[in-house]
Each structure stands twice: as structure tokens, then as C-alpha cells.
A protein has these predicted regions:
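Phosphate-binding glycine-rich loop
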Residues: 1-9
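Short beta->alpha connector loops at strand-helix junctions that form conserved
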Residues: 14, 33-38, 92
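Structural motif
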Residues: 11, 58-62, 89, 134-136
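Short beta-strand segments
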Residues: 14, 60-64, 119
């Protein structure tokens, strides 16, 4: 809502989380759907080409991707930031399962001014029904978000639930480790049956 709107362009890489395109279109933003390779990764040639041809105001990178679980590399995120003149949104709903997180880039002394990282309590915290999430972004973006945020977008119960959940961070990390190990066990077993298993760093 903040960076979309009439006369602007958003880029997604399909297949991916459908709400990026749907919400962008409700603001009359033009949505361009780029593709992925056979392993559902975003390739650097496709990324560069779509940025060059479309000049997007918004570029969405879901990592690990929903619904494929495919992680993107730091190199892909770096390339998106360096080539794009618009805002790069990295959706890390499954970020705690991944080896790389774009949040680390925002901790640098020279953090990217166009990068937004979004996360949710729905996955690793098992709080999907609460509908609670957050973003990590450069300070200049926060007043822009405030311009479009609903006045009652986050009730007190959600805030309390989120604060209580954070007390159990160690337990969450332990659960992530267990789920990741089970994911690998199942992937190995399926590969042993002769099935192709796509690389995943989701749950």
C-alpha cells in the first residue's frame, strides 16, 4: 500500500505467495510476473532482465519461497538491491529455517536504503491464527508506512501475545532445529525411492 499505486510497477517471481500480486493490484499497481528456473530459484539473468525492462517500484523476493521452500542466496538479494531503483521486499515468513537472512544486511554500517524484510509469527512461532507480523526496514520508510496504516491495525491482545511468545525464543529455535532435521530425513528417504526432491529451507 505504501509503495504501490496507480502508475507504479511491482515484480513477482512465480510461483510465489499469491498475496503480493493481489494486494498490489488492489492499489491499481501494475504487476509483472517473472519466472523461475527448473529448481524454482530466481536466476540472476532473469532478475537483471526484468529490472532492466520494467524498472519496478517494488520487487518481491520470497525466501524461502512459498510454496516451494526454495531459499535465495545473498548474491540474488544483493543483485536485486544494486540493480533496482525501487524498494526490494524480502519476505522471510520461513526465515528462521534458512541459512541466510537479509536482516543481516540491515545490520551493516552501510545498510541498503531500499531493503525491507518482513517476517511473521505464523510459521516458526505456530501463531497463524493471531495474524501478527513485523518488518525490518531503514528509518526513512517508517513515516511512509504511517501514512497508510489503519488506525486500529494491531490490537492489544496481538501485542501481548507477541511479547509473551518472545520469552520462548530458545524453545522456538529448538523446534526449528527438530523440524529441519525431520525435513532432511524425509527428503533423503524420498530421494532413496528415486523421486526428485527439490531443495527446501522451509518447514
Amino acid at each position: 500500500l505504501t509503495f504501490g499505486g496507480h502508475g507504479r510497477t511491482a515484480v513477482t517471481f512465480e510461483p510465489t505467495y499469491a498475496m503480493y500480486g493481489q494486494i498490489a493490484r488492489t492499489t491499481q499497481c501494475r504487476v509483472v510476473e517473472a519466472g523461475r528456473d527448473d529448481d524454482f530459484r530466481i536466476t540472476e539473468p532473469v532478475l537483471e532482465a526484468v529490472i532492466e525492462s520494467e524498472r519496478p517500484d517494488l520487487l518481491f523476493v520470497c525466501s524461502p519461497n512459498n510454496p516451494t521452500g526454495t531459499p535465495e542466496s545473498r548474491e540474488v538479494v544483493d543483485l536485486a538491491i544494486s540493480k533496482s531503483q525501487g524498494v526490494v521486499v524480502v519476505d522471510e515468513a520461513y526465515g528462521q529455517f534458512a541459512d541466510f537472512t537479509a536482516i543481516e544486511m540491515l545490520k551493516q554500517s552501510e545498510a541498503p536504503e531500499s531493503l525491507v524484510v518482513t517476517r511473521t509469527f505464523s510459521k516458526t512461532w505456530s501463531m497463524a491464527g493471531v495474524r501478527l507480523g513485523y518488518c525490518v526496514a531503514p528509518p526513512w520508510m517508517l513515516p511512509e508506512f504511517e501514512k497508510v496504516v489503519l488506525p486500529y491495525h494491531l490490537d492489544s491482545l496481538k501485542q501481548i501475545a507477541g511479547r509473551i511468545a518472545l520469552r520462548f525464543h530458545d524453545e522456538m529455535e529448538e523446534r526449528v532445529t527438530q523440524i529441519s532435521a525431520e525435513r532432511q530425513r524425509i527428503a533423503t528417504a524420498l530421494s532413496g525411492l528415486g523421486l526428485k526432491v527439490f531443495p527446501s529451507q522451509a518447514n
